[in-house]
């Protein structure tokens, strides 16, 4: 494993972080037991991963991450989130209510008040059985929420940091709703986060010209998400992404472009599309840590191996630039 200082914070993290959110939720969404999820987290630690990211949903990944890491808590970093829907402590207990409330809050620009944010953070600490958080993010903030989030929630996070309950303040974007990074660009202009979480992958490289240089100039740590989640799990996913995404290629052209790209990967010894995706993001200048999310121990090992491989061959990099 390789390790990196996370921007201007004093945190030193593995270059790969295990995410507890996303579609898999450590395998809990795909049939894994609590014990299997704990074993996966501990396997990640054995592989050298020291950053573990959760979604701040009480009764879910936070509690499992806390239990799994208790024996090695002093050796790891925990990153988690507070959602900004009103009454975050309530909605975080129920996944469907969480989704509905978060979507409504995004649409209407609603933000929890300061007391609700602090209460949620305290509940998260209890769920993790921890006395501190290394990184606490304002979660999935959309442009319409940003001003209220800074007004209401940021002072709470600053007090928590001053009290030693959190070591770094972060903010994550809603990549699917804000693919051009308008919110993070504004946050970096105002220079309050220590860490940001941004979407970046082979199909949407726009952070390269906005978030990444701004973060570098400010000394802000960058965690990269969505390395494979948008159309990069399989050949069929890539065809759909090229057909339905920006540019909307005719399906036959999308299939031909995908087939040519997959042939190139094979010719250069790149074993899979997801391997290429993780490797690509890991070596993007300006991204400190990439998130991997899985419930499968074999996939975890493969993803870590991909991230720790060298940069992709130059012909493959040129082909990535030509994909979209």
Where are these regions (language model features)?
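Active-site mouth loops of central-metabolism enzymes
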Residues: 22-35, 102-118, 141-147, 175-178
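Active-site groove signature of glycoside hydrolases
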Residues: 123-144
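Short, acidic/polar
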Residues: 30-44, 112-127, 177-187, 277
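N-terminal binding-site loop/beta-alpha segment at the start of enzyme catalytic domains
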Residues: 1-88
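Acidic (Asp/Glu)-rich catalytic clusters
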Residues: 8-10, 66-77, 125-131, 158-162, ...
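Beta/alpha (TIM)-barrel catalytic core signal, keyed to glycine-rich beta->alpha loops juxtaposed to Asp/Glu
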Residues: 3, 141-324
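Conserved, mostly hydrophobic/aromatic
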Residues: 6, 18, 37, 52, ...
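Structural preference for beta-strand elements that scaffold enzyme active sites
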Residues: 13-17, 50-51, 57, 75-79, ...
């Amino acid at each position: 494993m390789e390790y990196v200082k996370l921007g201007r914070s004093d945190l030193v993290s593995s270059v790969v972080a295990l995410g507890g959110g996303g579609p898999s939720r450590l395998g809990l969404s795909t049939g894994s037991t609590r014990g299997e999820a704990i074993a996966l987290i501990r396997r990640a630690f054995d592989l050298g991963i020291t950053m573990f990211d959760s979604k701040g949903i009480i009764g879910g990944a936070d509690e499992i991450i806390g239990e799994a890491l208790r024996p090695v808590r002093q050796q790891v970093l925990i990153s988690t989130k507070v959602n900004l829907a009103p009454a975050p402590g309530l909605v975080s207990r129920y996944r469907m209510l969480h989704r509905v409330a978060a979507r409504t809050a995004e649409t209407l620009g609603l933000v929890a008040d300061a007391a609700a944010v602090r209460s949620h953070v305290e509940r998260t600490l209890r769920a993790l059985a921890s006395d501190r958080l290394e990184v606490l993010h304002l979660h999935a903030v959309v442009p319409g929420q940003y001003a209220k989030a800074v007004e209401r929630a940021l002072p709470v996070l600053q007090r928590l940091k001053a009290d030693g309950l959190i070591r770094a303040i972060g903010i994550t974007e809603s990549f699917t709703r804000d693919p051009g990074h308008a919110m993070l660009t504004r946050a970096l202009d105002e220079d309050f986060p220590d860490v940001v979480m941004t979407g970046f992958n082979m199909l949407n490289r726009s952070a390269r010209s906005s978030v990444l240089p701004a973060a570098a100039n400010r000394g802000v740590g960058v965690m990269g998400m969505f390395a494979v989640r948008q159309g990069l799990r399989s050949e069929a996913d890539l065809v759909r992404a090229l057909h339905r995404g920006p540019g909307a290629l005719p399906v036959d052209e999308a299939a031909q472009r995908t087939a040519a790209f997959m042939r190139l990967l094979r010719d250069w010894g790149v074993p899979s599309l997801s391997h290429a995706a993780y490797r690509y993001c890991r070596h993007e200048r300006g991204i400190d840590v990439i998130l991997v999310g899985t419930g499968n121990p074999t996939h975890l090992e493969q993803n870590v191996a991909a991230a720790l491989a060298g940069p992709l061959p130059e012909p493959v990099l040129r082909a990535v630039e030509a994909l979209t």
